[in-house]
Amino acid sequence: NILFATCLLGAFAFSSCEKNLYDESKQSEKEIKMTDLNIPEDFQWNLTQVTKGTTIANTQTKVSLFLDEKCSKDEKVATIPVYNKAINLPLSLPTYVKTIYAQYQSKSGKMITKSVAVNANGSYTLNIPDAIEANPTRAITRDNNKKDDDYNIEDDIKYDKERGVVYHPKKGWGTIMFEDQFPSLGDYDFNDFVANYQVLFEVSKAKEKDEYESKYIAIGLCLKAVGGVFPYNPYLRLKKIKNKNIESVMMSHYKTGEEIEVNLIDNKNPKGNLIIDCTPLVQNLDRRGSKYFNTERNALVTKEEDLPEIIIEIKLKEPKEIDDILEDDEFDLYLKRNDNGTEIHMNGIEPIAYQYPFNDKNLYPIYEDGEEEDDNYYYSNERLIWGLRVPGNVAHTIEKGDFLKAYKGFAKWAQSGGKNEQNWYNQGNADDNLLIHY
């Protein structure tokens, strides 16, 4: 787990204007609730997109890619070998990103930062004309007992010109937030279950294709809050990876390095997907006298280091092209209720063993089409959802906090079908009085 440990660490205010949600010039007559929002019928609630890009350089070299011009550590999305022929590189990027930044060493030895436009259709081309040749491969020795900021997987790949890493959603955390009252609508403070996530793919060029592929995947999960009272536990399904393709799965506590027994879910798993029981993330929580975890002002975690955190390492028998496993819905972190088996997934994802309430008139209709998976699971008739995935480390609301007041751009984003305010979670205008940052 040391291979990944140090890589891991390193919604909403909208005023009602009489009865017209979009007329901001009129005085507010009532407070808008989540259930008042006018959500477009085809809105998918996506905050990320998988881009289809190509990379090429004058010589084989190493390039790092970032979401920001400063090339901040937490905003890194990849460090990859680039060749003197075009190679396809898919990346999972926030929808607001129109430019990524490539950092590499030139022939003169200078570090160069180059901007790369991301087109409206998600395509981009990275062309490096003046890179220095990558260092030759040297033998790598891993010290599994070493846990400090000077050692991580990128220390290894720096000396191996054939290996790289791709992050999802980036080197810093993403955040998953749930409402837990499905199929009923909740209070929409989105703090019933909140966890940070980060996925790392160790990549190399495929032997017979101009693609990058991965045989090793590391996943970090950090519990931020449990503001629900129903007995739910978290599980992780990787939809494009089958149990039969697994060489090994390891789980450990990040802070202690203590190994955790892995429980893979085989029964009632007809598609044979890899499903990992992540219950250790929520065991033995210090709720500080509250019935919740880290959602009430008088019972908060006092420092970030007290948040439970686990690392999952997966080795595959055969590598997979990362294009197959980068999509958000292929990384299915979901909740399962202990007493009645209810599953809550992100919108559009079919449950595993739970009998979905197809006849519930409050839910969006599901239409089966042969073997095609319908994408209307876990939507209400009003197109509301029970799970939200954000490609950043976002704060969660206090118990009964108004998500729309906490994140002032959220309502506009949702009602525009994702066209406006795409970076609502990172605009600097959130109401910190309603938010808990760890």
Residue ranges and their predicted role:
Residues A13-I39:
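Bacterial Sec-dependent N-terminal signal peptides
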Residues F43, P129-L185:
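Compositionally biased low-complexity segments at domain edges in trafficked proteins
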Residues T48-E75, F190, P231-N233:
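Short, ordered, surface-exposed loop/turn motifs in non-cytosolic proteins
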Residues C71-K98, Y254-T256, E261-D266, P270:
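Tryptophan-paired
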Residues V82-A120, Y124-E133:
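Short Pro-Gly-centered beta-turn/loop motif in secreted/extracellular proteins
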